[in-house]
């Protein structure tokens, strides 16, 4: 085993941040980048008039709306570790992109608004992360506002998500009366609104503050000591094994907006979070991240990260070996050899050429149309295929045409590139070949329309055909006469036939009429 490679892998920390919209995910990402020395000041998403947009919200529509709709990747060095943050869309319509991103990380950070507690989108994303069995770290955000009692927030983790919460620090007051954090793990108090080393007060051996400190006489500090005592006696005990399996989550408190508690969280996170681990490939083989053969999988494709060049980037999570510029790889799906001359690392839309990357790193490959989401690539003689990424059956459908028939070329180009990103799905009417788009949520259509106009100068006309139940059919069983006004026959972008049923009743009617025909939810 290559010792140097093993050392590099050990330094990697690759994670995603999950939350409900507006819980402060982008703000905490910005503060981490600040500590990593990547940016000089954190851009606040809300301040749209100032033109200070968040670093991770790089696409035009995100800047206008203040929501993340694509996952972006940010990389930086911190305390001898290489940090790879994958920022994920908080908006529910973009769950496909988010779910795929969660397949490319080794840990997750869950950001919760301390006034609202666990919200629906957090719950959904938590389930995906839990299923993967990777560690989950929790940051209870917005302590600078009046919120719910910390004991309630910890209890809710267990009640709603079924995961044990173990407090790493504890608020002293909240909102207007916030004084600081009682840092259990580091045996100190972190004062609110203080800079530099002045903000830390060491605790006595018995966990109290020296009498000379004014805070020691504050009734709120006494309340905190009582709560800490209660948590120590009745709460969960810190258990590294449970954390590794995703059965226990270390809980940190703070305010990302005022940069309070974030550094303490980040320091603990890089110590506790895992380095890249083995992947299951080829069905049942374990592939070590330190395996000398390079391999990785495409979890995202993004068009127009640089609108001036109309490029496409395939995001690859490295699973094993070491990537070097000019590396020859094989695309597992086609067996096609590809030389990887141009690869890039990210700071949102800023890019630098990659000279080398190891397991845990995310590299962007310039794509001329070779790659699809879920593709595996490998450098050796042994074929390596990673498990398929989750796919979703759309529920909303729209007919789409170009407003200007003279601009068919840009219409088709934009359509194909955006469909290959996997943010929207394309179907064609079996008889007429007209385009039909499918999506998980309405916002995807709006983003599609906006990007077609903004990035491809192609205005589109969209007409809803509403909610539909999509079911694929074996081509050998298909008779086009099975189609009628209640079950539209279309083909997906790979040419596979499927029906879009008006509702579940129409699907049941079809089953009754053709009992021997097998329909499937997803190919």
UniProtKB/Swiss-Prot annotation:
GTP binds at residues 19-26, 87-91, 141-144. It comes from the Bacteria. Pfam families: EF-G_D2, GTP_EFTU, RF3_C. Keywords: Cytoplasm, GTP-binding, Nucleotide-binding, Protein biosynthesis. GO terms for cellular component: cytosol. One of its GO terms (molecular function) is GTP binding. Residues 10-277 form the tr-type G domain. Gene3D superfamilies: P-loop containing nucleotide triphosphate hydrolases, Peptide chain release factor 3, domain III, Translation factors. The keyword Plastid does not apply. InterPro entries: EF-G-like_DII, EFG_III/V, G_TR_CS, P-loop_NTPase, PrfC, RF3_C, RF3_dom_3_sf, RF3_GTP-bd. GO terms for biological process: regulation of translational termination. It is found in: Cytoplasm. SUPFAM superfamilies: EF-G C-terminal domain-like, P-loop containing nucleoside triphosphate hydrolases, Translation proteins. NCBIfam families: prfC, PRK00741.1, small_GTP. Belongs to the TRAFAC class translation factor GTPase superfamily. Classic translation factor GTPase family. PrfC subfamily. Increases the formation of ribosomal termination complexes and stimulates activities of RF-1 and RF-2. It binds guanine nucleotides and has strong preference for UGA stop codons. It may interact directly with the ribosome. The stimulation of RF-1 and RF-2 is significantly reduced by GTP and GDP, but not by GMP. This is Peptide chain release factor 3.
